Amino acid sequence: MAESHGGAKGPAAGAHTGAEGGHGGGFPPFESSTYASQLVSLAIFFVVLYVIVSKLALPKVGGAIEARQNKIEGDLAEAQTLRDQSDAALKAYESELASARSRAQAIGNESRDKANAQAETERKALEEQLAAKLAGAEKTIASTRTAAMSNVRGIAADAAGQIVQQLTGVVPDAASVNAAVDASLKG
């Protein structure tokens, strides 16, 4: 089939295929005669790519990774420092709290002991006052009883003497009336 430049004479018109297109052979990368030059070009390309990546890109990425690692380590160190500080502050707080509780307990015990001692002193003083008043009251009661009994004896002797006089018409002897009253009071 000859190539024509005039019009289209079918679906393959104007298409270059095979030797008709002016090229000889197949697809150039697959031709075995060009393998050596392709491998050299590929090796040069990878060496250039390796140099570019290792000299330009990797240091930047490595620097970023190292900076990030340093930042992480710094943050962890700072976090540990802050944690240590907070632990120390917590221990100090707990120590102060325990100390305050201990002081409050001691103050409470001391106040209770003082109040108990003061109450005991006041109780003893009050007991002594009450004992003195009771002794005085007992003396007063005893003297009043003695006085009342002596008055009762006198009243009883007078009454007995008058009763005997009324019944017998004779005035009894005062000594015999007193002896009879004393005998009756004793028993």
UniProtKB/Swiss-Prot annotation:
One Pfam family, short name: ATP-synt_B
Main location: membrane
Transmembrane residue ranges: 39-59
Subcellular location: Cell inner membrane
GO MF annotation terms: proton-transporting ATP synthase activity, rotational mechanism
Job of this protein: F(1)F(0) ATP synthase produces ATP from ADP in the presence of a proton or sodium gradient. F-type ATPases consist of two structural domains, F(1) containing the extramembraneous catalytic core and F(0) containing the membrane proton channel, linked together by a central stalk and a peripheral stalk. During catalysis, ATP synthesis in the catalytic domain of F(1) is coupled via a rotary mechanism of the central stalk subunits to proton translocation.
Subunit structure: F-type ATPases have 2 components, F(1) - the catalytic core - and F(0) - the membrane proton channel. F(1) has five subunits: alpha(3), beta(3), gamma(1), delta(1), epsilon(1). F(0) has three main subunits: a(1), b(2) and c(10-14). The alpha and beta chains form an alternating ring which encloses part of the gamma chain. F(1) is attached to F(0) by a central stalk formed by the gamma and epsilon chains, while a peripheral stalk is formed by the delta and b chains.
Protein name (record): ATP synthase subunit b 2
Organism: Bradyrhizobium diazoefficiens (strain JCM 10833 / BCRC 13528 / IAM 13628 / NBRC 14792 / USDA 110)
